[in-house]
């Protein structure tokens, strides 16, 4: 069920060229966020690959001293780049709205879950930056505690987005138009990501093995699946924008706001 909207008067229609340019920029912002966040986390701050959960407090402090500058600069850079994720989320939701022909349940869930998404990057880095800021003055045990909180909130937080993936996949399957907004295989990519993210909920119980925060099921498979999703989704959004523009031109449809 969705809220049906009547076409607005011509004077309230949005300039279509502006809308499509904005959506294309928003789709590309998904690539930018992934590239910058991945580069910062893997190469600058070196929080990925994750530390061994069984590292001693002294080992954690030594690691943090060695990577202090990278951790703090990662937070600075991400503060400028991660907000672009909202553009990506909004455009994804807009295209889902085409499927439901209004602000339906699936679209609204996508919007709300998408609002939470940047917090999954920001909040953990704030915690780690607070630890690294005065790293020389902190006891190893405090630094170990804050590192635990970082990985719990970063790796474990990903499980929350299972619902977002399910909603996007479901919307893709219910699209019965001749030329669907998203191809059918994209639904299964989303369902796969939802399944792969689920083991992240178990990291609080394990310090080693595939379900630890550096394990195969809790980190590496979700990381790979997320990369596939984050590459395919912007590409499909660009195609969806093209189809929307063509559809509007053929039918001379106003853009609903």
Map each language-model feature to its residues.
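Hydrophobic, aromatic-enriched alpha-helical segments typical of multi-pass transmembrane helices
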Residues: 2-257
């Amino acid at each position: 069920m969705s809220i049906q909207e009547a076409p607005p008067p011509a004077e309230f229609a949005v300039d279509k060229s502006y809308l499509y340019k904005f959506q294309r920029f928003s789709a590309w912002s998904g690539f930018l966020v992934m590239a910058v966040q991945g580069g910062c986390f893997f190469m600058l701050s070196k929080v990925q690959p994750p530390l061994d959960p069984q590292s001693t407090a002294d080992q954690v402090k030594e690691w943090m001293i060695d990577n202090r500058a990278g951790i703090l600069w990662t937070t600075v850079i991400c503060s400028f780049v991660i907000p672009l994720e909202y553009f990506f989320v909004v455009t994804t939701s807009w295209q889902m709205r085409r499927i439901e022909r209004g602000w339906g349940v699936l679209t609204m869930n996508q919007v709300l879950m998408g609002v939470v998404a940047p917090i999954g990057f920001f909040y953990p880095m704030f915690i780690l930056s607070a630890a690294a800021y005065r790293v020389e003055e902190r006891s190893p045990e405090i630094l170990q505690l804050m590192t635990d909180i970082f990985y719990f909130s970063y790796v474990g937080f990903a499980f929350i987005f299972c619902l977002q993936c399910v909603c996007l996949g479901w919307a893709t399957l219910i699209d019965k138009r001749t030329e669907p907004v998203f191809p059918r295989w994209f639904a299964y990519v989303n369902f796969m990501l939802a399944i792969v993210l689920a083991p992240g909920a178990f990291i609080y119980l394990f310090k080693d093995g595939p379900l630890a925060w550096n394990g195969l099921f809790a980190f590496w498979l979700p990381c790979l699946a997320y990369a596939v999703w984050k590459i395919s989704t912007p590409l499909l959004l660009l195609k969806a924008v093209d189809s929307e523009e063509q559809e509007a031109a053929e039918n001379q449809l106003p853009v609903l706001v």
